[in-house]
Design a protein with these regions (language model features):
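Extracellular/oxidizing-compartment recognition motifs
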Residues: 1-122, 130-131, 147-150, 162-179, ...
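Active-site diphosphate/adenylate-binding microenvironment
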Residues: 138-162
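Well-ordered alpha-helical scaffold segments within catalytic/enzyme domains
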Residues: 134-145, 190-207
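Short alpha-helical patches at coil-to-helix transitions and adjacent helical residues
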Residues: 125, 129-132, 184-192
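C-terminal PAP-associated
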Residues: 212-215
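Short, charged/polar micro-motifs that form catalytic or ligand-binding hotspots
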Residues: 43, 125, 139-142, 181
Length: 215
């Protein structure tokens, strides 16, 4: 009771060191103080993008302690994403090409959690419209995503209704410096490019009809 477990997320080990500067202001830590009872614990209202997870144990006085034997077995990582089926696959005789495709596929899985985000780990994790439209064609090849994109574009039109039809940089929009901006070329192209790419891949004009007034 009173002992603390600290989980810290990171993507890389730089020269053998636990490196998190690329996370910028994202703390990416989970602290749990035990009440002395055996519990199954998980984070709420957040998620982490990581390759490595550091586990630290702190006693009641705040001093680091040795980890219990076999403690790694007490942790399980769960992958979170929106539910869609994979429809595309590339396999060649070149391992590096195959790995490149897998990296792109997992990049999509990691960033498709309710909205198409720019990254799953640092202090953004936002639905940038520029990122969404430029990756949309690849996304349609990889996964069956018409419903996913329809929901995102519904959110976009809701934001447009608030800012006079302009397309925001980020959907859903946040009131933060630069992020709350709207009406820029490339980012605003999402209103045309994304519904068009969905139509080309799936042949359904419904999304075009829904989005046309906001184009």
């Amino acid at each position: 009771e009173g002992e603390e477990i600290i989980l810290s997320a990171a993507e890389i080990l730089q020269d053998g060191c636990f490196y998190r500067e690329n996370y910028r202001s994202a703390v990416a830590e989970y602290h749990f103080i035990s009440d002395g009872k055996k519990r199954h614990v998980r984070p709420h209202f957040t998620f982490y993008g990581f390759r490595y997870m550091k586990v630290e144990y702190v006693d009641k006085s705040g001093k680091p302690t040795e980890k219990p034997e076999g403690s790694v077995d007490n942790f399980t990582a769960h992958h979170l994403r929106s539910d869609f089926d994979q429809t595309g696959c590339i396999e060649t005789g070149v391992k590096k090409v195959n790995q490149l495709f897998q990296n792109a596929l997992w990049g999509q899985k990691d960033n498709f959690l309710d909205v198409p985000t720019d990254c799953p780990q640092r202090d953004e994790r936002l639905g940038w419209t520029g990122d969404a439209q430029i990756f949309s064609e690849t996304a349609c090849y990889n996964m069956y995503v018409p419903a996913f994109y329809r929901k995102y574009l519904w959110d976009m039109r809701a934001e447009q209704s608030i800012i006079g039809g302009s397309v925001p940089h980020v959907v859903p929009r946040l009131k933060r410096e630069f992020i709350e901006g709207h009406g820029s070329c490339a980012w605003a192209d999402v209103a045309v490019v994304l519904p068009w790419n969905v139509y080309v891949h799936y042949g359904d004009k419904t999304l075009l009809e829904e989005c046309y007034p906001g184009m």
